[in-house]
A protein has these predicted regions:
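Rossmann-like NAD(P) dinucleotide-binding subdomain of oxidoreductase/dehydrogenase enzymes
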Residues: 86, 95-231, 235
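ALDH superfamily catalytic-core signature
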Residues: 122-125, 129-137, 155, 159, ...
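N-terminal Rossmann-like NAD(P)+-binding subdomain of aldehyde/semialdehyde dehydrogenases
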Residues: 1-106
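Conserved C-terminal structural/oligomerization subdomain of aldehyde/semialdehyde dehydrogenase
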Residues: 299-425
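A structural signal for short, well-ordered beta-strand elements
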Residues: 18-19, 230, 316, 339
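Flexible, glycine/charged-enriched surface loops at secondary-structure junctions
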Residues: 22-23, 91, 167-174, 247-254, ...
Length: 425
C-alpha cells in the first residue's frame, strides 16, 4: 500500500475512529499496556539491533541515549499509558452553549482533528506516546520515525496496532511508514491528512512547512535558558541549574545557556563551576566569565546551539532586561527560567520573555506533557496558534458548532418577525 493509499484509507476510517466510545478507546490503551508488558523481551531484542547499528554508524552519544529503549523505559511508557486511561475523555466536551432564540440553540463541542501525520526523531518512546494520545483523542495517525530506530519502531507499532484493533479500534486508523522517501509522499497528501507534527530541528520543521499544503504544528529545537538574577538563593540556583543541564541532556528541555547577573557572578559561578566539574559539564564562557572561573571560550555560534550534551554556554548580563533581550534573540521560544527572590523582577521576566514556557525558580526539565499532567505529549509547540507548549490531549482536539432549531429561517430575523436573545445556557 502506498502512502497516499494509506492516507486515503485513514481519511475514510477517521469518522469511525472519531465516533468510537470512551470505553473502546480506554480499553485499547489498557490492551496496549498489557501487550507491551508481555512482549518486553521482543522489544528489547529489536532495540539492541538498532543500538548496535547506530554504534557501527558512529552516531553521537546523545542519539544513542534517545535510542535506548530498555526495561526501565518500557515500564515508563506503560505507566504513562495507564495514567492516560485515568484522564477524562477530551471529546464531546461542551465548550459553549447559547440560546439564540427560544427554539434555536448553539453548542460548541470538542472533536478530533482527524488524520494526523507525525514525523519524529530516534526516540522509540515517542511512537508509543504519540499513538496512544491519538487513540485517546479519537484521531487516526500515520507515523514516520527515524531510521535509527527502525527495528524498535516496527516491533512497537505491530504490538500497539494488534492490541488496539483487538478491542475495536479501526485497523485503518494506525499506520507506520519507514522509508525516507515516504516523507515527501506524506507531504503531498493534503487531501487526506489534516495536520502534520514534525519533531526535530528548526531547519527540519521549516523544510516541512515550506514543502506541504498541510497545516503544520512545529516542534522546534530547544535552546533553553536560565537567568540567575542578582537577588537569589545561591544553593537553590545551583540545584536548579544542575538539574536543568544534567538530569537528562539529550532532550529539548535541557538548559543550554546560562545568563548570570554580573553582581551575583563572583559568589555563584565558583560554586556552580565546582558542581559542573562533578557532573563532567564543559563550560563555555564569555571573557568576563573567564575572569571569574576557568572555562573555554564561548562564541556567538555557541549561543545559537542546542548541545544535547554535557556542555553549557555562560554569559554575564547587567540587568533582567538584557537577559530578556538575549533570550528573545537567541532562544527557540521553548522554555526559559529565572531564578530570583524578587517578585517584580520575576514578573518582568514572565511578561516579556516570548516563550511557550516561562518558569520561576524551577528546572526547565519540567517542560513535559507528563509532568504537566497531560498524560504524555506528541511534542512541544513553539508556535502561537491552536496549541502551545507540551501538546497533549487538549492540543489534539478541535471543535465543531452544533446548531439545533425548529424550522428557523434567517429571513424571519432580517424582516423583524423574530429576534435573537443570545442567552447563555
Amino acid at each position: 500500500m502506498t502512502v497516499e493509499e494509506m492516507a486515503k484509507a485513514m481519511k475514510m476510517a477517521s469518522p469511525i475512529m472519531a465516533a468510537s466510545s470512551t470505553e473502546t478507546r480506554n480499553n485499547a490503551l489498557l490492551a496496549i499496556a498489557k501487550a507491551l508488558n508481555e512482549k518486553k523481551e521482543e522489544i528489547i531484542i529489536a532495540n539492541n539491533k538498532d543500538l548496535e547499528q547506530a554504534k557501527e554508524d558512529g552516531l553521537r552519544d546523545s542519539v544513542l541515549k534517545r535510542l535506548k529503549f530498555n526495561e526501565e523505559k518500557i515500564d515508563g511508557v506503560i505507566k504513562g499509558i495507564n495514567d492516560l486511561v485515568t484522564l477524562g475523555d477530551p471529546l464531546s466536551k461542551v465548550q459553549l452553549k447559547k440560546e439564540l432564540d427560544s427554539d434555536l440553540v448553539l453548542t460548541r463541542i470538542s472533536c478530533p482533528i482527524g488524520v494526523i501525520g507525525v514525523i519524529f526523531e530516534s526516540r522509540p518512546d515517542a511512537l508509543v506516546q504519540i499513538s496512544t494520545l491519538c487513540i485517546k483523542s479519537g484521531n487516526s495517525v500515520i507515523l514516520k520515525g527515524g531510521r535509527e530506530a527502525a527495528n524498535t519502531n516496527k516491533a512497537l507499532f505491530e504490538i500497539i496496532k494488534e492490541a488496539a484493533v483487538s478491542v475495536g479500534i479501526p485497523a485503518d486508523s494506525l499506520f507506520l511508514v519507514q522509508a525516507r522517501e515516504d516523507i515527501q509522499r506524506l507531504l503531498a497528501c493534503h487531501e487526506y491528512v489534516d495536520l502534520l507534527i514534525p519533531r526535530g530541528s528548526n531547519e527540519f520543521v521549516q523544510y516541512i512547512m515550506n514543502n506541504t499544503k498541510i497545516p503544520v504544528m512545529g516542534h522546534a529545537d530547544g535552546i533553553c535558558h536560565i537567568y540567575a538574577d542578582k537577588e537569589l538563593d545561591t544553593d537553590m540556583a545551583v540545584k536548579i541549574i544542575i538539574d536543568s543541564k544534567t538530569q537528562y541532556t539529550a532532550v529539548c528541555n535541557a538548559t543550554e545557556t546560562l545568563l548570570v547577573h554580573k553582581d551575583v557572578a563572583p559568589a555563584l559561578l565558583p560554586k556552580l563551576n565546582q558542581a559542573f566539574k562533578e557532573k563532567n559539564v564543559l563550560v563555555k564562557g564569555t571573557e568576563d566569565v573567564k575572569g571569574i572561573i576557568d572555562c573555554e571560550d564561548a562564541t556567538e555560534e555557541d549561543f545559537k546551539t542546542e548541545y544535547l550534551d554535557l556542555i553549557i554556554s555562560v554569559k554575564l548580563v547587567s540587568s533582567v532586561r538584557e537577559a530578556i533581550d538575549h533570550i528573545n534573540k537567541y532562544g527557540s521560544h521553548h522554555t526559559d527560567c529565572i531564578i530570583t527572590t524578587n517578585d517584580e523582577t520575576a514578573y518582568e521576566f514572565e511578561k516579556f520573555v516570548d516563550s511557550a514556557g516561562v518558569y520561576r525558580n524551577c528546572s526547565t526539565r519540567f517542560a513535559d506533557g507528563y509532568r504537566y499532567g497531560f498524560g504524555a505529549e506528541v511534542g512541544i509547540s513553539t508556535g502561537k496558534l491552536h496549541a502551545r507548549g507540551p501538546v497533549g490531549l487538549e492540543g489534539l482536539v478541535t471543535y465543531k458548532y452544533i446548531l439545533e432549531g425548529n424550522g428557523n429561517i434567517v429571513d424571519d430575523y432580517v424582516n423583524g418577525k423574530r429576534s435573537f436573545n443570545f442567552k447563555e445556557l
